[in-house]
Every structure is written in C-alpha cells, then in structure tokens.
Amino acid sequence: MNMLSCDTSHVKSLNVQGLTKLNTLSCGNNELESLDLSGLSALTGVDCQNNKLKILNLVGTTMLTAVYATKNELESLDLKDCVELAELYCNSNKLTALDVKTATKLKVFDCSSNNLSQDAFKKLFESLPQREVGDNATCLIYTEETGVAEGNYKTFTEDELKVAKDKNWKVYKNSASHVQEAL
C-alpha cells in the first residue's frame, strides 16, 4: 500500500504500523488523539490536520518531506528524524517549543497560533537551517486574525528577527485582514 486516505471518516484511532511501503497518509478531519508513524521510513507526506492529536510520533520517518498538522492539540513535536522535511504546518496547536535543526531542507513552515514564547522563538530562529536567497524560505510566526487564538510572542524587535533573516528566511505574520505581511 503506497497511499492511505481516510479523511473525514470519524476515525478515533488508526494503526498504520507495519505499512512499511506507505508513502502518503491523509487522515485529516477526524477525531484522532494520537498517531504513531514511527518506523515508517518510506513515508514522504502526512496530512493529519483538524484532529485532536496530542501525540504525533515521527521517530524513524527519515523520508518525510511534508507534515500538515494544523489544528490539533500538540504540545510538542519531535522532528529529529525528519531530515528530509521541506514543509511544516503546525499552526493552531499548543506547542511551547519547536526545534528544526535536523530539518536541513526545510523551506516553508507555519507555527502561528501556538504558545511559543520569546525564548522559544530565539531557540527556533537559531535552529533554522541556512537558506540561499533563491530558496524563498518563509516562516509564518503569528496571526492577528480576528477570532483566531494566538498565544505566540508577537512583539519582535529587528534584532530578534535578524537571526532568521541572516539565514535568508522571510518572516511573516497574518494581518487582521488575512494578508501575510513581512516582519
């Protein structure tokens, strides 16, 4: 089996252990509280948005290039084995820290609407991989949209953003009018 799709199926649990040839998993819009993808070394993409995930186990997912984990209840996310990761959408969770240092191919991520403090952002920016100007690497770090809970630190100084910008990352926020604005 190369692909498994069970979106919007009212699924409360999903066992994918042993599906060693699985490339793509799409299980968004369900009621999952945990998802164990450990050891799925052929997995390149996972879409688990709009669940109730408190645990997303990515240990051994060394080929994973894209993670869509928006709108869950994740408090932590271990990406240490995600060495091929290029896209990460973990916005609208409860993350208090995010370390992407092993994701050396990362070019796009959204971590808005979490619980990332000033210190957590300092560590996150330090962990960002160096990019080339032509990579157009972007990160969306907070939102000002009406009706969206934002727990992230928002009052960045130029010096705080300089670490990311010096690595050729474009840093954005979502404005109240739903437009991405450069910081």
Regions of interest found by a model, annotated:
Residues M1-T20, S41, T62, T104, ...:
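N-terminal capping/linker segments that flank leucine-rich repeat
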Residues L14-V16, L35-L37, L56-L58, L77-L79, ...:
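Canonical leucine-rich repeat
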Residues M1-C6, N23-C27, T44-C48, L56, ...:
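Conserved hydrophobic beta-strand positions in leucine-rich repeat
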Residues L88-N91, L95-S113, D119-A120:
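Acidic, glycine-rich calcium-binding repeat modules characteristic of RTX/beta-roll
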Residues M1, V11, L22, L32, ...:
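Conserved hydrophobic position(s) of the canonical leucine-rich repeat
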Residues S13, S34, K54-N57, T96, ...:
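Ser/Thr- (and often Asn-) enriched beta-sheet segments in non-cytosolic proteins
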Residues S9, N30, N51, N72, ...:
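Consensus "Asn ladder" position of solenoid repeat domains
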